[in-house]
């Protein structure tokens, strides 16, 4: 997709997507809009069954809300967050999915269990629990606990509103991993198959070599983003994470929504994959980074292939 020069600010669009024309976005491109707002009024203004994919990472439970000192505990999730997810269920198309990236923090001597409670709460709301993906971090930050190892995984739970959720694994194929013996055998095969004798003596059969590209697993091995971060956001997931789910669960031109958008990583992935997007972030300190991230284009896009 051609990108505008870094000096050219993408124009503001009106009425995209349908249903929020009366709300002025803080920033927009030909594909999407950013709103600096609480996410509830944006969700309420959207028409029902208008979203193809919702992907988000809400604040971790019990942790300060980054710079403002507010804590997002279990009560916050039971009240505000569940109101958000109730609206998301209404706004999803019948084939749409909701992907929730979440990891409970440790509390004293035990791990929090809110991530598992959320699965049950969402099922009670009417969601179908489709899949759980694990985001594995090869180089996690060092731990600060005497009796625990480095925290190297987070969960991405996929939910839908009907059993007919769309799914495009062919967009996410990964190179097959063959051992040395398999690779040597593949080099000897003519036309990618060979004929071998049946053990029963009933003739011959063809044995086809395995494919070069295969479906990926539910283990997503991605480096986290930490350390030097010009946006000062403490929990920005890598752009490869939303990119994977956008490829897997949507087609070009469909609409992606993130109600807790942060610095706009979901928007950057959607923009470069040709999907329409709507991002909401209440903290302008974080959302201000999005125009530069969109304009950076290849520098960002190269990190999610």
Predicted ranges, named:
Residues 285-305:
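Cysteine-dependent PTP/DSP-like catalytic domain, specifically the C-terminal lobe
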Residues 1-289:
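Core catalytic lobe of class I
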């Amino acid at each position: 997709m051609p990108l505008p020069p870094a000096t050219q600010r993408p124009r503001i669009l009106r009425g995209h997507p349908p249903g929020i024309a009366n709300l002025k976005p803080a920033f927009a491109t030909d594909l999407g809009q950013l709103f600096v707002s609480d996410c509830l009024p944006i969700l309420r203004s959207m028409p029902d069954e208008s979203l193809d994919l919702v992907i988000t990472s809400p604040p971790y439970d019990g942790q300060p809300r980054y710079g403002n000192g507010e804590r997002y505990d279990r009560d916050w999730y039971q009240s505000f967050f569940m109101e958000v997810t109730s609206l998301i269920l209404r706004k999803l198309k019948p084939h749409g999915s909701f992907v929730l990236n979440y990891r409970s923090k440790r509390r004293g001597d035990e791990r929090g269990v809110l991530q598992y409670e959320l699965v049950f709460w969402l099922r009670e709301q009417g969601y179908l629990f489709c899949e759980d993906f694990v985001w594995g971090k090869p180089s996690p930050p060092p731990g600060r606990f005497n009796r625990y190892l480095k925290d190297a995984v987070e969960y991405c739970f996929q939910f839908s509103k009907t059993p007919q959720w769309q799914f495009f694994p062919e967009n996410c194929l990964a190179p097959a991993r063959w051992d040395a013996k398999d690779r040597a055998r593949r080099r000897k095969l003519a036309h990618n198959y060979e004929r071998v004798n049946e053990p029963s003596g009933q003739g011959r059969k063809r044995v086809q070599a395995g494919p070069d590209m295969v479906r990926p697993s539910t283990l997503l091995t991605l480096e986290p983003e930490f350390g030097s971060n010009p946006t000062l956001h403490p929990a920005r997931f890598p752009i490869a994470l939303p990119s994977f789910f956008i490829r897997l669960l949507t087609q070009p031109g469909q609409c992606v929504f993130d109600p807790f958008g942060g610095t706009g990583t979901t928007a950057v992935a959607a923009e470069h994959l040709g999907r329409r997007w709507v991002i909401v972030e209440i903290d302008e300190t974080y959302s201000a980074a999005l125009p530069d991230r969109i304009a950076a284009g290849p520098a960002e896009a190269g990190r999610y292939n």
